[in-house]
Amino acid sequence: MKKYLSLLCLVCAMLGTAIGVKAQTTQLTNHYAMKLIEDGQGGYKLLQEAHYAKARMDMSKLTDVLVPYKYEPQRLTSKLYKGVETVDIVYKKANGYELILSVDKAVSDKPAPFMIYLHGGGWRTSNNGSSKILSQYLAKQAGITGVRVSYTLAPQPGATIQVTIQDVMDALKYVQNHAKELHVDPSCFGFLGMSAGAHLAAVGAMKSQAKLLVGYSGIYDLQKAKITAKTKDAQRIAYFDQLNPKTLAAVSPINLIPQKNIPACLLVCGTYDLTVECEQSKMLADAVKQKGGEAVLSVYPFYDHNLSSKGSDKMEEIFFKSADFIQKNLK
């Protein structure tokens, strides 16, 4: 019976991921990445209008807030990233499910630096395809191997934040232990993540002698972020050890900054983010600088949580800013 229950939990998690991905590809947004829905009168309205109002986010000066946005490639054409060899590797098995590394291989005469990419999804949905284009772009254009990591999600059997963080560290360890066959330099790597993935990427970067961290709309102080500290979601509460303050502090990147060899940080956020406060990125940037590290903070006024996605007109700007930052620091 336990085996069947575990299988059922895994199927539910996979279905949630599939539904979330589908919704993400069909959701209307304006160019600020705010979600739109039809208003029944031939126009549009903000899906979360009441939430913006409650958060006192003034829309009065945004004349284009109800105009749908559709991404059209400008600088980022498919020829820049298509054709990269990708291999899927099972790096870990746990509680009846497999965890996968999707490795986008750089073509290089010498062992390549590599990036670890961690997807968002509130620690409970989505998959490791979210950074595929950036990973393959850097593999093809910059000789940087990309490692897109799947990790234990909150609905899966035995899931806790500590288990998920261990997955991240085990993924890194797997790549380093197999550096020769993957043709990578085990000492030259960085982390990138979005939202919950930015939290995990930051933990991984601070604990591992990483060269750099790129975080989009990330959670870095879990004792202050509303998505954790004020959550009413029973599954998330259990995942975070019943919101035990010691646990939240122990897994907060702002408390994990090393005394030396601090990873260079590029932190991106939008001031109208309803999911994660932009202040989270500001706090980590300040903390890194106070310890003598490098932190580049890119704040986008009026932009919502998914400003780094194709639902935002800043997607390509953030994409190439990230690519340049990664190439500069992975030396």
Name each model-derived stretch.
Residues 54-109:
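N-terminal cap/lid segment of alpha/beta-hydrolase-fold proteins
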Residues 127-135, 145-186, 310-317:
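Catalytic nucleophile-loop/oxyanion-hole region of alpha/beta-hydrolase
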Residues 282-285, 289-331:
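C-terminal catalytic histidine-bearing segment of alpha/beta-hydrolase fold enzymes
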Residues 260, 266-269, 273:
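Short beta-strand/loop motif that positions the catalytic acidic residue
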Residues 170-229:
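Primarily recognizes the serine-hydrolase "nucleophile elbow" in alpha/beta-hydrolase
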Residues 274-280:
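Conserved alpha/beta-hydrolase "acid-adjacent" motif
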Residues 78, 219, 223-256:
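Mobile cap/lid helix-loop segments that gate and shape the active-site cleft of serine hydrolases
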Residues 111-121:
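Short beta-strand element of the alpha/beta-hydrolase
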